Amino acid sequence: MLMVISPAKTLDFETPPTTARFTRPQYLDHSQELITQLRELTPAQISELMHLSDKLAGLNAARFGSWDPAFTLDNAKQALLAFKGDVYTGLQAETLSDAQLDYAQDHLRMLSGLYGLLRPLDLMQPYRLEMGTRLANARGKDLYAFWGTRISEWLNEALADQGDDLLLNLASTEYFSAVKRSALKARIIDTEFKDLKNGHYKIISFYAKKARGMMSRFVIEERINSPEALKQFDVQGYRYNSEQSTPDKLVFLRNSAED
């Protein structure tokens, strides 16, 4: 089983990584192409394109300017440890053992507007480039056109390396839209996490994001390799619901949030 999750806007490059092991992103030639184009934008243009404050636009203009593909632990950090935010709060990667990180390296991928697809130990430098950004480029009108079917092809390669065809989608709609389902040689398992609110079960963004991270952790810890085993997910009050689920969409319900 291969999992995909979204990246995060919030980054942590201050806390020292919990491991010195790292790998190099596999698709940096594509990243360099985007960086070359992004360096041509002024902070004001970045602000308009990405809907950022002047301060954040200036920060990211500086990031694009200093981006250097010669990644080391001095100028970059492992992606799974650098991303923060709700999904990564649920995943708690900083407490994974070496053996669990090894398993994650083979079974988890992070979708990225700049890097395309990242493995957990791939080094990355700080950036802001959401997949939904309408950055016109030589390949089309936005980043979905830029990446085309490449991400799907790379996922196919990762699945082939495993001898498996099961892809667990724990990413947001914005990011999983960069995966062309028609190009995937895989069975996709989608997930939904709903909380009880005002008498109805609803997807509440903050909780759903955290739950995606918790399920990622569950798969890594238990080495889950089938949809049937995924149904045993029982963390912080979520329970599998057969009535709302289908064979390819697993729905988990929770009656009250637990800390």
Curated annotation (Swiss-Prot):
One of its GO terms (biological process) is response to hydroperoxide. It comes from the Bacteria. Pfam families: H2O2_YaaD (PF03883). One of its GO terms (cellular component) is cytosol. Belongs to the UPF0246 family. NCBIfam families: PRK02101.1-1, PRK02101.1-3. This is UPF0246 protein PSPTO_1244. It comes from Pseudomonas syringae pv. tomato (strain ATCC BAA-871 / DC3000). The lineage of its organism: Bacteria, Pseudomonadati, Pseudomonadota, Gammaproteobacteria, Pseudomonadales.
